[in-house]
C-alpha cells in the first residue's frame, strides 16, 4: 500500500483557493440536468465523487461539455425526468451525494417505463438508504433491494412519484431529505414532507433549498419539521455562470493548521457562504484562534487554544478536524451528537478513536460522542495512520505533522474523493 510520511512542520503560512464543494458540485450537476435550458457550472470540483455523477448523467443521456481542467461544465438540461434505458446499471463508487439524489430522481415518471440498477463499491453496500426508500415508496415509487434489505444496490422503476403526504426519518442523514426535496417539484402532485425525529445536519438542507431556489423552485420550510413542495413544476437553468463555492469542509484543515501553528487565509468561501461547515471557523474561535471573515475569505491565525465541549451535529464533516485539532489545545475536548459519523465513508467514530490512540492520545469513544485529552508537542508518537478509504481521515491526520513528530498516512490518494491535490497544497503552505 502506498504511504506518505509528513515530517514535522514548524509553521504554516499563506493563502489557498479552495476547490469546489463536493455537496454543491453534485447538486448543481443534477439540477442542471433536470432543468430546461443550458447551465454553465464553474469551479466544479474535480474528484471521484463528481466523476461518478458525470458518468451517470452521460449514461442517462445528458449532454455536457467538460473543460480540460474539469472545473467548468456546460450542461444541456433535459427539462424533466430522465429517459431511462431499461436494464441500465449505474456504478456510483462510494459517492453518497450521487447515490441518494439519483435514487429519487430516477423514480420520476419517464415517457417509457424502464427499470434501472444503482450500485457501487463494497462500502456503498454498507451505507444505509432505507429511510429514503421508505419515503419514496410512500409516494408511489417502485424500488427493490437487490442484496441486503435497507442497503444498495437498488432496482428502480421510473413509474413516477405521486406526491401527497410523506414521512421521512431525519435522524441518520440529511441526504435522504435532500434527495426527496430535489425530486419533489417533478412529482405528479404537491408533496408535504414531514420529518420524523430530529433532523441532522440542517445546514445541508439549507444548501439544497438555496440551490433549488437558484433553479427556480421555492419550497416552504416550516421550522425543519414540514416541507411543502408544489408538484408538476420544472427547474429552469440560471442565467450566467453558476459558481460552485469552495468546499468549506476542505477549508477546515487549512484553517485548523493556521490556528495551531501560523496564519492561513482560505478563499472561495466567506461570511455569505451557504455551507454550514463555514461555522467550523466559529468553533476555532471559541477554542481561542484569531478568525477574520471577509466576503470571500476566512483567515485563521495562531493563538493559544483551549478545549471545548460542544454539540457538532450541524457540522459533522468539519467536526472531524476538531478531533485532531483538540490534541493541540489545553484541556479536554468533547464532540457530541455525532452518531452519523458511524454511517459515513467508514465508521468515523471508531476510526478516529483508534488512530488518535496510535499517536499517543487518551480518548473515550461513546455511541454518539468522542472525548479527547490533549498532548504536549513532544509527547506525540510517530504512527502509521490507517485511512479506511476515507478522504477525511487522511486530511485530518495530516495535522499531526504540526507536532514535533512525523506522521505516516497510509493510502494518501484516498483524498481523491474530494481533494486530489490536498497534500500538494498543504506542502505549499508548510515551513519546515
From Swiss-Prot:
Binding, phosphoenolpyruvate: 22, 96, 127, 175, 348, 392, 417
Keyword Transferase: yes
GO MF, one example: 3-phosphoshikimate 1-carboxyvinyltransferase activity
InterPro entries given in the database record: Enolpyruvate_Tfrase_dom, Enolpyruvate_Tfrase_sf, EPSP_synthase, EPSP_synthase_CS, RNA3'P_cycl/enolpyr_Trfase_a/b
Compartments it resides in: Cytoplasm
Pathway: Metabolic intermediate biosynthesis; chorismate biosynthesis; chorismate from D-erythrose 4-phosphate and phosphoenolpyruvate: step 6/7
GO CC entries: cytoplasm
Catalytic activity: 3-phosphoshikimate + phosphoenolpyruvate = 5-O-(1-carboxyvinyl)-3-phosphoshikimate + phosphate
Pfam families: EPSP_synthase (PF00275)
Keywords: Amino-acid biosynthesis, Aromatic amino acid biosynthesis, Cytoplasm, Transferase
Residues bound to 3-phosphoshikimate: 22-23, 27, 173-175, 201, 317, 340, 344
Subunit structure: Monomer.
Free-text function comment from the UniProt entry: Catalyzes the transfer of the enolpyruvyl moiety of phosphoenolpyruvate (PEP) to the 5-hydroxyl of shikimate-3-phosphate (S3P) to produce enolpyruvyl shikimate-3-phosphate and inorganic phosphate.
Family: Belongs to the EPSP synthase family.
Protein name as catalogued: 3-phosphoshikimate 1-carboxyvinyltransferase
Source organism: Mannheimia haemolytica
Amino acid at each position: 500500500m502506498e504511504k506518505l510520511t509528513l515530517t514535522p512542520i514548524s509553521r504554516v503560512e499563506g493563502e489557498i483557493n479552495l476547490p469546489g464543494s463536493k455537496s454543491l458540485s453534485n447538486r448543481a450537476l443534477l439540477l442542471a440536468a433536470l432543468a430546461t435550458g443550458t447551465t454553465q457550472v464553474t469551479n466544479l470540483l474535480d474528484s471521484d465523487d463528481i466523476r461518478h455523477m458525470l458518468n451517470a448523467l452521460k449514461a442517462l443521456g445528458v449532454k455536457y461539455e467538460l473543460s480540460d481542467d474539469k472545473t467548468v461544465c456546460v450542461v444541456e438540461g433535459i427539462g424533466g425526468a430522465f429517459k431511462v434505458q431499461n436494464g441500465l446499471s449505474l456504478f456510483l463508487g462510494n459517492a453518497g451525494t450521487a447515490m441518494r439524489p439519483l435514487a429519487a430522481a430516477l423514480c420520476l415518471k419517464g415517457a417509457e417505463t424502464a427499470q434501472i440498477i444503482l450500485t457501487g463499491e463494497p462500502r456503498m453496500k454498507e451505507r444505509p438508504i432505507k429511510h429514503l426508500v421508505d419515503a419514496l415508496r410512500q409516494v408511489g415509487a417502485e424500488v427493490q433491494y437487490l442484496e441486503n434489505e435497507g442497503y444498495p444496490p437498488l432496482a428502480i422503476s421510473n413509474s413516477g412519484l405521486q406526491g401527497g403526504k410523506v414521512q421521512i426519518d431525519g435522524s441518520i442523514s440529511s441526504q435522504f431529505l435532500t434527495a426527496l426535496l430535489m425530486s419533489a417539484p417533478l412529482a405528479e402532485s404537491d408533496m408535504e414532507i414531514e420529518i420524523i425525529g430530529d433532523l441532522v445536519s440542517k445546514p445541508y438542507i439549507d444548501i439544497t433549498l438555496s440551490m433549488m431556489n437558484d433553479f427556480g423552485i421555492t419550497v416552504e420550510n416550516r421550522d425543519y419539521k414540514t416541507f411543502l413542495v408544489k408538484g408538476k413544476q420544472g427547474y429552469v437553468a440560471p442565467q450566467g455562470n453558476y459558481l460552485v463555492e469552495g468546499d468549506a469542509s476542505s477549508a477546515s484543515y487549512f484553517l485548523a493548521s493556521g490556528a495551531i501553528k501560523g496564519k492561513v487565509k482560505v478563499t472561495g468561501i466567506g461570511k455569505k457562504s451557504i455551507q454550514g461547515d463555514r461555522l467550523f471557523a466559529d468553533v476555532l474561535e471559541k477554542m481561542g484562534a484569531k478568525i477574520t471573515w471577509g466576503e470571500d475569505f476566512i483567515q485563521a491565525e495562531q493563538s493559544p487554544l483551549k478545549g471545548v465541549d460542544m454539540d457538532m451535529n450541524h457540522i459533522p464533516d468539519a467536526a472531524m478536524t476538531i478531533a485532531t485539532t483538540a490534541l493541540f489545545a489545553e484541556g479536554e475536548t468533547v464532540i457530541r451528537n455525532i452518531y452519523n459519523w458511524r454511517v459515513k465513508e467508514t465508521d468515523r467514530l471508531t476510526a478516529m478513536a483508534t488512530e488518535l490512540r496510535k499517536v499517543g492520545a487518551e480518548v473515550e469513544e461513546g455511541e454518539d460522542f468522542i472525548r479527547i485529552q490533549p498532548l504536549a508537542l513532544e509527547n506525540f508518537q510517530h504512527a502509521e495512520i490507517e485511512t479506511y478509504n476515507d478522504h477525511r481521515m487522511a486530511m485530518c491526520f495530516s495535522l499531526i505533522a504540526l507536532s514535533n513528530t512525523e506522521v505516516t498516512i497510509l493510502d494518501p490518494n484516498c483524498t481523491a474523493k474530494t481533494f486530489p491535490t490536498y497534500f500538494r497544497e498543504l506542502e505549499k503552505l508548510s515551513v519546515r
